């Protein structure tokens, strides 16, 4: 393949992956915010921004709508779209580039081929995280910035820029990267399973009449997303709880310290708070990966691999 052809395919991968991600993430913003509120509620109670725990997904929706209005469900979505566009675009674009480096073919053995897919997916996700972590931090702080404890009260942050300004003033650059190490581990586990399993299972399951089926592709993507997100969810909780301590007097000494203290004070179940909402949110992730494949088939008559 010529250099021009490779660059053209790379640009198509980058654009289509990013657009699909941005659209899906915006559609899933309400459940995304509910997930973050439930996940971080114990930290929010400590900080005085939440007066009592949420009893479930529906109750969280009701309370948030009553206290903050329906539009508040998209709080933090701007940062999420800005973050998610390059994250997914880079993942989709570099996934195949990195996979090509391993040079494993299915004929060489399924286990070796599967391991190559797993490694390439994890590495692609880990690399993209280096560039967008501070946006993920800002999105988390905005989404978890509730004012339900005091109706009509002031929020901690007025917007994306304000998150950066206040965090840099109180904690410096380190504050924007709090929870980064467990994030790296989590992103490798999640993305490795996300891309690795999808690429490995797709040619086995989506064959014959199911090969170009949007529903079949969507269901496979949802199943893979659900499994990957559940497996890495405790790491996600630890990193976000660490993020919430930036600007606070008391902080965790590290990921292990956060894990130990959360389990000791709240029980192991606390690591999975919001997991139900996260599974529902996985519909968006499944939509992204299936839309990516379907758009390529519709526009170009094939997928770019």
From Swiss-Prot:
Mode of membrane association: Multi-pass membrane protein
Pfam families (alphabetical)? Mito_carr (PF00153)
Q: Where in the cell is it found?
A: Mitochondrion inner membrane
- Which residue stretches belong to region Important for transport activity? 239-244
Q: Which GO terms describe its molecular function?
A: ATP:ADP antiporter activity
Question: Regulation of activity: what does the record state?
Answer: The matrix-open state (m-state) is inhibited by the membrane-permeable bongkrekic acid (BKA). The cytoplasmic-open state (c-state) is inhibited by the membrane-impermeable toxic inhibitor carboxyatractyloside (CATR).
Keywords assigned by UniProt, alphabetized: Antiport, Membrane, Mitochondrion, Mitochondrion inner membrane, Repeat, Transmembrane, Transmembrane helix, Transport
Q: Residues that bind ADP, according to the entry?
A: 83, 95, 239
Q: Where mainly located?
A: mitochondrion
Where, by residue number, does the polypeptide cross the bilayer? 10-37, 78-102, 110-130, 180-201, 215-235, 275-295
Q: Which reaction does it catalyse?
A: ADP(in) + ATP(out) = ADP(out) + ATP(in)
Q: What are the recorded Gene Ontology BP terms?
A: mitochondrial ADP transmembrane transport; mitochondrial ATP transmembrane transport
Keyword hit for Repeat: yes
Solcar repeat boundaries on the chain: 8-101, 112-204, 212-298
Recorded GO cellular component terms are: mitochondrial inner membrane
Q: Where is this motif: Nucleotide carrier signature motif?
A: 239-244
Q: How does it assemble?
A: Monomer.
Write out the similarity annotation.
Belongs to the mitochondrial carrier (TC 2.A.29) family.
Q: Domain text from the record?
A: The transmembrane helices are not perpendicular to the plane of the membrane, but cross the membrane at an angle. Odd-numbered transmembrane helices exhibit a sharp kink, due to the presence of a conserved proline residue.
Q: What does this protein do?
A: ADP:ATP antiporter that mediates import of ADP into the mitochondrial matrix for ATP synthesis, and export of ATP out to fuel the cell. Cycles between the cytoplasmic-open state (c-state) and the matrix-open state (m-state): operates by the alternating access mechanism with a single substrate-binding site intermittently exposed to either the cytosolic (c-state) or matrix (m-state) side of the inner mitochondrial membrane.
Q: What is this protein called?
A: ADP,ATP carrier protein
Q: Which organism is it from?
A: Kluyveromyces lactis (strain ATCC 8585 / CBS 2359 / DSM 70799 / NBRC 1267 / NRRL Y-1140 / WM37)
């Amino acid at each position: 393949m010529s250099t021009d052809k490779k660059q053209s395919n790379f640009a198509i991968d980058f654009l289509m992956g990013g657009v699909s991600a941005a659209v899906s993430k915006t559609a899933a913003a309400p459940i995304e915010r509910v997930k973050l509120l439930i996940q971080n509620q114990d930290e929010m109670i400590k900080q005085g921004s939440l007066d009592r725990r949420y009893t479930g997904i529906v109750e969280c929706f009701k309370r948030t709508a009553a206290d903050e209005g329906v539009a508040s469900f998209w709080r933090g979505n701007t940062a999420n779209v800005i973050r998610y566009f390059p994250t997914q675009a880079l993942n989709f674009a570099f996934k195949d580039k990195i996979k090509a480096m391993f040079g494993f073919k299915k004929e060489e053995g399924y286990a070796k081929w599967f391991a190559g897919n797993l490694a390439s997916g994890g590495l692609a996700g880990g690399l993209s995280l280096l560039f967008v972590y501070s946006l993920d931090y800002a999105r988390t702080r905005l989404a978890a910035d509730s004012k339900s404890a005091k109706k009509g009260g002031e929020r901690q942050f007025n917007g994306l820029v304000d998150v950066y300004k206040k965090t840099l003033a109180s904690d410096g650059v380190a504050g924007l990267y709090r929870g980064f190490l467990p994030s790296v581990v989590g992103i490798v586990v999640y993305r490795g399973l996300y891309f690795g399993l999808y690429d490995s299972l797709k040619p086995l399951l989506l064959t014959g009449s199911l090969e170009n089926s949007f529903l079949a592709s969507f269901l496979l993507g949802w199943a893979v997303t659900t499994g990957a997100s559940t497996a890495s969810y405790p790491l996600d909780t630890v990193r976000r709880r660490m993020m919430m301590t930036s600007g606070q007097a008391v902080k965790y000494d590290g990921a292990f310290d956060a894990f130990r203290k959360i389990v000791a004070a709240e029980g192991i179940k606390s690591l999975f708070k919001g997991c139900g909402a996260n599974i529902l949110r996985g519909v968006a992730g499944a939509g992204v990966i299936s839309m990516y494949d379907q758009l390529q088939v519709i526009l170009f008559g094939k997928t770019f691999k």
